Amino acid sequence: MATLLSKGYNIIVFGRSAKNESLEERISRLLQWFGIDSCLDQVTCVDTDLSQDNLGIPTGEYSRLCSVVDSVIHCASDTSFSESKREKVMAANINNLKGILEFSKNAHVNFFHYISTAYVAGTGVTYCKETLSSVKTFTNVYEESKAEAEKIISRFCEKNSICLSIIRPSIVYGDSQSGRSLKFNALYFPVRSAQTIRDIYLNDILNNGGLKAAKNGIFIDKEGYLFLPLKIYLPHEGNINIIPVDYFVNTTIKIIENCSSNGIYHLTNPFHTTMKIIAKYYEQLMKVNGVEIIYGPMPDDLLRNPVAELFDRFIKPYRPYLSDDRVFDRTNTILATDNLNPPEFTYDIFKTCMEYAIKVNWGTSIFV
Protein backbone atom coordinates (compact mmCIF):
# COMPACT_ATOMS: atom_id res chain seq x y z
CA MET A 1 0.00 0.00 0.00
CA ALA A 2 2.74 2.48 0.94
CA THR A 3 4.49 2.15 -2.41
CA LEU A 4 1.25 2.54 -4.35
CA LEU A 5 0.43 5.70 -2.41
CA SER A 6 3.95 7.06 -2.96
CA LYS A 7 3.45 6.52 -6.69
CA GLY A 8 0.30 8.65 -6.58
CA TYR A 9 -2.43 5.99 -6.61
CA ASN A 10 -5.69 6.49 -4.75
CA ILE A 11 -6.62 3.45 -2.68
CA ILE A 12 -9.85 2.24 -1.13
CA VAL A 13 -9.07 -0.02 1.82
CA PHE A 14 -11.63 -2.65 2.77
CA GLY A 15 -10.98 -3.73 6.34
CA ARG A 16 -12.10 -3.86 9.94
CA SER A 17 -11.55 -2.14 13.23
CA ALA A 18 -9.36 -4.03 15.69
CA LYS A 19 -8.43 -3.83 19.37
CA ASN A 20 -10.42 -0.66 20.07
CA GLU A 21 -8.85 1.01 17.06
CA SER A 22 -10.89 2.10 14.06
CA LEU A 23 -9.86 1.15 10.53
CA GLU A 24 -8.94 4.78 9.86
CA GLU A 25 -6.73 4.85 12.96
CA ARG A 26 -5.04 1.60 11.95
CA ILE A 27 -4.25 2.90 8.47
CA SER A 28 -3.09 6.27 9.80
CA ARG A 29 -0.72 4.52 12.21
CA LEU A 30 0.70 2.41 9.37
CA LEU A 31 1.26 5.42 7.14
CA GLN A 32 3.09 7.18 9.96
CA TRP A 33 5.30 4.12 10.37
CA PHE A 34 6.09 4.23 6.65
CA GLY A 35 6.74 7.98 6.90
CA ILE A 36 4.04 8.87 4.39
CA ASP A 37 1.23 10.17 6.60
CA SER A 38 0.92 13.06 4.13
CA CYS A 39 -0.65 10.51 1.73
CA LEU A 40 -3.62 9.88 4.02
CA ASP A 41 -5.90 11.95 1.78
CA GLN A 42 -5.31 9.38 -1.00
CA VAL A 43 -6.88 6.66 1.15
CA THR A 44 -10.57 5.91 1.64
CA CYS A 45 -11.28 3.48 4.48
CA VAL A 46 -14.40 1.32 4.29
CA ASP A 47 -15.41 -0.92 7.18
CA THR A 48 -16.33 -4.28 5.69
CA ASP A 49 -17.30 -7.79 6.69
CA LEU A 50 -16.27 -10.29 4.03
CA SER A 51 -18.78 -12.83 5.33
CA GLN A 52 -21.79 -10.53 4.79
CA ASP A 53 -23.83 -9.70 1.69
CA ASN A 54 -22.44 -6.64 -0.09
CA LEU A 55 -19.48 -6.94 2.31
CA GLY A 56 -21.65 -5.41 5.02
CA ILE A 57 -21.56 -2.06 3.21
CA PRO A 58 -24.79 0.02 2.99
CA THR A 59 -26.44 -0.27 -0.44
CA GLY A 60 -25.87 3.31 -1.55
CA GLU A 61 -22.21 3.32 -0.56
CA TYR A 62 -21.71 -0.10 -2.14
CA SER A 63 -23.05 1.16 -5.48
CA ARG A 64 -20.87 4.26 -5.31
CA LEU A 65 -17.77 2.17 -4.65
CA CYS A 66 -18.60 -0.11 -7.57
CA SER A 67 -18.60 2.94 -9.83
CA VAL A 68 -15.09 4.11 -8.91
CA VAL A 69 -13.01 0.94 -8.50
CA ASP A 70 -11.12 -0.42 -11.53
CA SER A 71 -8.81 -3.01 -9.90
CA VAL A 72 -8.87 -5.17 -6.78
CA ILE A 73 -5.88 -6.45 -4.81
CA HIS A 74 -6.98 -9.21 -2.43
CA CYS A 75 -4.41 -9.93 0.27
CA ALA A 76 -6.56 -10.77 3.30
CA SER A 77 -6.07 -14.30 4.63
CA ASP A 78 -5.74 -16.43 7.74
CA THR A 79 -2.18 -17.77 7.78
CA SER A 80 -2.64 -20.31 10.59
CA PHE A 81 -0.99 -23.70 9.96
CA SER A 82 -2.70 -25.63 12.75
CA GLU A 83 -5.15 -28.37 11.77
CA SER A 84 -7.17 -27.50 14.87
CA LYS A 85 -7.99 -24.17 13.18
CA ARG A 86 -9.13 -25.74 9.88
CA GLU A 87 -12.69 -24.42 10.07
CA LYS A 88 -11.52 -20.87 10.80
CA VAL A 89 -8.87 -20.93 8.05
CA MET A 90 -11.26 -22.31 5.44
CA ALA A 91 -13.90 -19.74 6.38
CA ALA A 92 -11.46 -16.86 6.01
CA ASN A 93 -9.59 -18.02 2.92
CA ILE A 94 -12.36 -19.71 0.93
CA ASN A 95 -15.85 -18.89 2.19
CA ASN A 96 -15.09 -15.18 2.45
CA LEU A 97 -14.07 -14.97 -1.21
CA LYS A 98 -17.67 -14.73 -2.38
CA GLY A 99 -18.23 -11.14 -1.27
CA ILE A 100 -15.08 -9.65 -2.76
CA LEU A 101 -15.53 -11.58 -6.01
CA GLU A 102 -19.14 -10.40 -6.35
CA PHE A 103 -18.00 -6.85 -5.69
CA SER A 104 -15.39 -7.19 -8.44
CA LYS A 105 -18.05 -8.40 -10.86
CA ASN A 106 -20.48 -5.63 -9.92
CA ALA A 107 -17.73 -3.03 -10.25
CA HIS A 108 -16.72 -4.38 -13.68
CA VAL A 109 -13.07 -4.26 -12.60
CA ASN A 110 -10.34 -4.62 -15.19
CA PHE A 111 -8.08 -6.72 -12.98
CA PHE A 112 -8.22 -8.92 -9.89
CA HIS A 113 -4.84 -9.39 -8.21
CA TYR A 114 -4.68 -12.24 -5.69
CA ILE A 115 -1.84 -12.59 -3.18
CA SER A 116 -1.39 -16.33 -2.71
CA THR A 117 1.66 -18.39 -1.69
CA ALA A 118 4.30 -20.36 -3.57
CA TYR A 119 3.47 -23.31 -1.33
CA VAL A 120 0.19 -24.09 -3.07
CA ALA A 121 2.59 -26.40 -4.93
CA GLY A 122 1.88 -28.94 -2.18
CA THR A 123 3.97 -31.96 -1.22
CA GLY A 124 5.57 -34.58 -3.45
CA VAL A 125 6.44 -32.04 -6.15
CA THR A 126 9.98 -31.07 -7.10
CA TYR A 127 9.40 -28.60 -9.96
CA CYS A 128 6.62 -26.09 -9.33
CA LYS A 129 5.15 -24.48 -12.43
CA GLU A 130 3.43 -21.11 -12.67
CA THR A 131 0.10 -22.85 -13.23
CA LEU A 132 -2.82 -23.82 -11.02
CA SER A 133 -1.89 -26.60 -8.60
CA SER A 134 -3.36 -30.05 -9.18
CA VAL A 135 -1.89 -31.81 -6.14
CA LYS A 136 -4.07 -33.26 -3.39
CA THR A 137 -1.65 -33.27 -0.45
CA PHE A 138 -0.32 -30.26 1.42
CA THR A 139 1.90 -29.50 4.39
CA ASN A 140 -0.89 -27.74 6.26
CA VAL A 141 -4.40 -26.31 6.00
CA TYR A 142 -3.11 -22.87 5.01
CA GLU A 143 -1.47 -24.22 1.84
CA GLU A 144 -4.57 -26.27 1.06
CA SER A 145 -6.91 -23.31 1.48
CA LYS A 146 -4.84 -21.04 -0.75
CA ALA A 147 -4.65 -23.66 -3.50
CA GLU A 148 -8.42 -24.09 -3.43
CA ALA A 149 -8.91 -20.32 -3.35
CA GLU A 150 -6.80 -19.92 -6.49
CA LYS A 151 -9.08 -22.33 -8.36
CA ILE A 152 -12.27 -20.62 -7.17
CA ILE A 153 -10.97 -17.18 -8.13
CA SER A 154 -9.69 -18.42 -11.48
CA ARG A 155 -13.05 -19.96 -12.42
CA PHE A 156 -14.93 -16.85 -11.32
CA CYS A 157 -12.69 -14.43 -13.20
CA GLU A 158 -12.82 -16.54 -16.37
CA LYS A 159 -16.61 -16.72 -16.20
CA ASN A 160 -16.92 -12.95 -15.70
CA SER A 161 -14.18 -11.86 -18.13
CA ILE A 162 -11.97 -10.37 -15.40
CA CYS A 163 -8.21 -10.45 -15.91
CA LEU A 164 -6.48 -12.25 -13.07
CA SER A 165 -2.96 -12.19 -11.69
CA ILE A 166 -2.00 -14.66 -8.96
CA ILE A 167 1.09 -13.58 -7.05
CA ARG A 168 2.86 -16.36 -5.14
CA PRO A 169 5.56 -15.25 -2.71
CA SER A 170 7.67 -17.72 -0.79
CA ILE A 171 8.71 -16.81 2.78
CA VAL A 172 8.92 -13.04 3.23
CA TYR A 173 11.28 -11.38 5.69
CA GLY A 174 12.08 -7.71 6.43
CA ASP A 175 13.47 -4.97 4.24
CA SER A 176 16.90 -6.01 2.96
CA GLN A 177 18.26 -2.47 3.39
CA SER A 178 16.76 -1.29 6.68
CA GLY A 179 15.61 -4.53 8.31
CA ARG A 180 12.23 -2.98 9.03
CA SER A 181 9.26 -5.34 9.14
CA LEU A 182 5.74 -5.51 10.50
CA LYS A 183 5.75 -9.27 11.04
CA PHE A 184 8.25 -11.57 12.70
CA ASN A 185 7.18 -15.14 11.93
CA ALA A 186 8.59 -17.73 9.50
CA LEU A 187 12.34 -16.99 9.13
CA TYR A 188 12.36 -15.11 12.43
CA PHE A 189 10.83 -17.89 14.48
CA PRO A 190 13.79 -20.32 14.58
CA VAL A 191 16.15 -17.43 15.32
CA ARG A 192 13.91 -16.04 18.05
CA SER A 193 13.49 -19.52 19.52
CA ALA A 194 17.24 -20.08 19.64
CA GLN A 195 17.76 -16.63 21.15
CA THR A 196 15.18 -17.35 23.86
CA ILE A 197 16.93 -20.60 24.76
CA ARG A 198 20.32 -18.85 24.75
CA ASP A 199 19.04 -16.16 27.11
CA ILE A 200 17.62 -18.71 29.56
CA TYR A 201 20.99 -20.39 30.02
CA LEU A 202 23.01 -17.19 29.81
CA ASN A 203 20.93 -15.78 32.64
CA ASP A 204 21.47 -18.99 34.61
CA ILE A 205 25.25 -18.71 34.22
CA LEU A 206 25.48 -15.00 34.96
CA ASN A 207 22.92 -14.73 37.75
CA ASN A 208 22.24 -18.17 39.24
CA GLY A 209 25.57 -19.92 39.43
CA GLY A 210 25.12 -21.82 36.16
CA LEU A 211 24.10 -25.17 37.68
CA LYS A 212 21.30 -25.77 35.17
CA ALA A 213 23.60 -24.81 32.29
CA ALA A 214 26.43 -27.04 33.50
CA LYS A 215 24.07 -29.99 33.84
CA ASN A 216 23.29 -29.68 30.12
CA GLY A 217 26.86 -29.10 28.95
CA ILE A 218 26.37 -25.36 28.43
CA PHE A 219 29.14 -22.92 29.30
CA ILE A 220 30.85 -19.71 28.25
CA ASP A 221 34.10 -20.51 26.44
CA LYS A 222 37.39 -18.63 26.68
CA GLU A 223 36.43 -16.41 23.74
CA GLY A 224 33.23 -15.31 25.47
CA TYR A 225 30.90 -17.41 23.32
CA LEU A 226 28.12 -19.47 24.87
CA PHE A 227 28.52 -23.14 24.00
CA LEU A 228 24.94 -24.31 23.34
CA PRO A 229 24.73 -27.98 22.25
CA LEU A 230 21.79 -27.78 19.87
CA LYS A 231 21.37 -30.48 17.22
CA ILE A 232 18.64 -29.63 14.72
CA TYR A 233 17.42 -32.61 12.70
CA LEU A 234 15.88 -31.95 9.29
CA PRO A 235 14.43 -34.72 7.10
CA HIS A 236 16.71 -34.15 4.11
CA GLU A 237 18.98 -31.60 2.50
CA GLY A 238 17.22 -28.60 1.07
CA ASN A 239 16.77 -24.86 1.25
CA ILE A 240 14.64 -22.27 2.93
CA ASN A 241 13.25 -20.06 0.16
CA ILE A 242 13.16 -16.50 1.45
CA ILE A 243 12.65 -13.09 -0.14
CA PRO A 244 12.85 -9.61 1.42
CA VAL A 245 9.71 -7.53 1.64
CA ASP A 246 11.20 -4.79 -0.56
CA TYR A 247 11.63 -7.31 -3.38
CA PHE A 248 8.10 -8.60 -2.80
CA VAL A 249 6.66 -5.07 -2.99
CA ASN A 250 8.69 -3.92 -5.99
CA THR A 251 7.96 -7.09 -7.95
CA THR A 252 4.26 -7.02 -7.13
CA ILE A 253 4.00 -3.39 -8.26
CA LYS A 254 5.75 -4.19 -11.53
CA ILE A 255 3.38 -7.09 -12.16
CA ILE A 256 0.32 -4.97 -11.38
CA GLU A 257 1.49 -2.15 -13.62
CA ASN A 258 2.87 -4.25 -16.49
CA CYS A 259 0.66 -7.31 -16.88
CA SER A 260 -2.07 -7.07 -19.49
CA SER A 261 -3.47 -10.59 -19.35
CA ASN A 262 -3.92 -13.51 -16.96
CA GLY A 263 -0.80 -14.80 -15.24
CA ILE A 264 0.61 -16.66 -12.25
CA TYR A 265 3.86 -15.36 -10.80
CA HIS A 266 6.31 -17.00 -8.41
CA LEU A 267 8.06 -14.47 -6.20
CA THR A 268 10.78 -16.82 -5.02
CA ASN A 269 14.55 -16.73 -4.61
CA PRO A 270 16.85 -18.46 -7.11
CA PHE A 271 19.74 -18.12 -4.63
CA HIS A 272 19.89 -21.05 -2.23
CA THR A 273 19.88 -20.45 1.52
CA THR A 274 20.20 -23.42 3.86
CA MET A 275 19.62 -23.79 7.57
CA LYS A 276 23.34 -24.47 7.90
CA ILE A 277 23.97 -20.96 6.58
CA ILE A 278 21.37 -19.44 8.91
CA ALA A 279 22.78 -21.37 11.87
CA LYS A 280 26.23 -19.98 11.08
CA TYR A 281 24.81 -16.46 10.87
CA TYR A 282 22.97 -16.97 14.17
CA GLU A 283 26.12 -18.16 15.94
CA GLN A 284 28.07 -15.16 14.68
CA LEU A 285 25.44 -12.59 15.67
CA MET A 286 24.46 -14.08 19.03
CA LYS A 287 28.00 -15.15 20.05
CA VAL A 288 27.05 -18.81 20.32
CA ASN A 289 28.77 -22.08 19.40
CA GLY A 290 27.46 -25.62 19.23
CA VAL A 291 24.52 -25.36 16.82
CA GLU A 292 24.56 -28.30 14.41
CA ILE A 293 22.25 -29.04 11.47
CA ILE A 294 21.84 -32.77 10.76
CA TYR A 295 20.04 -34.03 7.65
CA GLY A 296 18.22 -37.33 7.94
CA PRO A 297 15.79 -39.05 10.31
CA MET A 298 16.28 -38.61 14.02
CA PRO A 299 17.35 -41.93 15.61
CA ASP A 300 14.50 -43.54 17.56
CA ASP A 301 16.68 -44.12 20.60
CA LEU A 302 18.21 -40.64 20.62
CA LEU A 303 18.08 -38.89 23.99
CA ARG A 304 17.41 -35.21 23.28
CA ASN A 305 18.78 -32.65 25.71
CA PRO A 306 16.40 -29.97 27.08
CA VAL A 307 17.80 -27.38 24.66
CA ALA A 308 16.94 -29.50 21.61
CA GLU A 309 13.54 -30.56 22.96
CA LEU A 310 12.52 -26.96 23.59
CA PHE A 311 13.75 -25.82 20.18
CA ASP A 312 11.90 -28.68 18.44
CA ARG A 313 8.63 -27.62 20.06
CA PHE A 314 9.15 -24.01 19.08
CA ILE A 315 9.82 -24.66 15.38
CA LYS A 316 7.51 -27.62 14.72
CA PRO A 317 5.05 -25.72 12.42
CA TYR A 318 7.89 -24.36 10.28
CA ARG A 319 10.08 -27.48 10.04
CA PRO A 320 8.84 -28.56 6.54
CA TYR A 321 10.01 -25.24 5.09
CA LEU A 322 13.53 -25.42 6.52
CA SER A 323 14.86 -28.09 4.12
CA ASP A 324 12.75 -27.66 1.00
CA ASP A 325 13.94 -29.32 -2.22
CA ARG A 326 11.29 -27.79 -4.49
CA VAL A 327 12.32 -25.60 -7.42
CA PHE A 328 9.98 -22.80 -8.50
CA ASP A 329 9.52 -21.80 -12.12
CA ARG A 330 9.96 -18.00 -12.43
CA THR A 331 9.46 -17.53 -16.18
CA ASN A 332 6.38 -15.30 -15.93
CA THR A 333 7.87 -13.24 -13.12
CA ILE A 334 11.11 -12.64 -15.00
CA LEU A 335 9.23 -11.52 -18.12
CA ALA A 336 6.87 -9.21 -16.21
CA THR A 337 9.59 -7.55 -14.12
CA ASP A 338 12.51 -7.21 -16.55
CA ASN A 339 14.39 -9.96 -14.72
CA LEU A 340 14.14 -8.37 -11.29
CA ASN A 341 15.76 -10.72 -8.76
CA PRO A 342 15.88 -10.76 -4.96
CA PRO A 343 19.25 -10.41 -3.25
CA GLU A 344 21.20 -13.36 -1.94
CA PHE A 345 20.67 -13.74 1.80
CA THR A 346 23.99 -12.50 3.17
CA TYR A 347 25.16 -12.17 6.76
CA ASP A 348 24.81 -8.38 6.52
CA ILE A 349 21.14 -8.71 5.56
CA PHE A 350 20.56 -11.28 8.31
CA LYS A 351 22.23 -9.02 10.88
CA THR A 352 20.27 -5.95 9.81
CA CYS A 353 16.94 -7.77 9.95
CA MET A 354 17.54 -9.55 13.25
CA GLU A 355 18.90 -6.45 14.97
CA TYR A 356 15.75 -4.59 13.99
CA ALA A 357 13.59 -7.48 15.22
CA ILE A 358 15.37 -7.44 18.58
CA LYS A 359 15.14 -3.64 18.75
CA VAL A 360 11.33 -3.79 18.47
CA ASN A 361 11.15 -6.86 20.72
CA TRP A 362 10.02 -9.14 17.88
CA GLY A 363 7.10 -6.89 17.01
CA THR A 364 5.71 -5.90 20.39
CA SER A 365 7.29 -2.43 20.28
CA ILE A 366 6.95 -1.49 16.60
CA PHE A 367 4.68 1.48 17.18
CA VAL A 368 6.09 2.59 20.54
Task: Please name every model-derived segment.
Residues 1-4, 9-15, 327-368:
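Amphipathic terminal alpha-helices
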Residues 212-235, 299-341:
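A hydrophobic C-terminal alpha-helical subdomain
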Residues 172-177, 232-239, 265-273, 283:
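Glycine-rich Rossmann NAD(P)(H)-binding loop
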Residues 250-317:
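Mid/C-terminal beta-alpha module of Rossmann-like enzyme folds, strongest
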Residues 137-170, 175, 189, 194, ...:
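Active-site Tyr-X1-5-Lys
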Residues 71-74, 82-87, 91, 95-144, ...:
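Conserved Rossmann-fold NAD(P)-dependent oxidoreductase catalytic core, especially the SDR/UDP-sugar
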Residues 178, 187-247, 251-254:
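A conserved pocket-lining segment of Rossmann-fold NAD(P)-dependent short-chain dehydrogenase/reductase
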Residues 1-71, 75-78:
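N-terminal Rossmann/SDR dinucleotide-binding element
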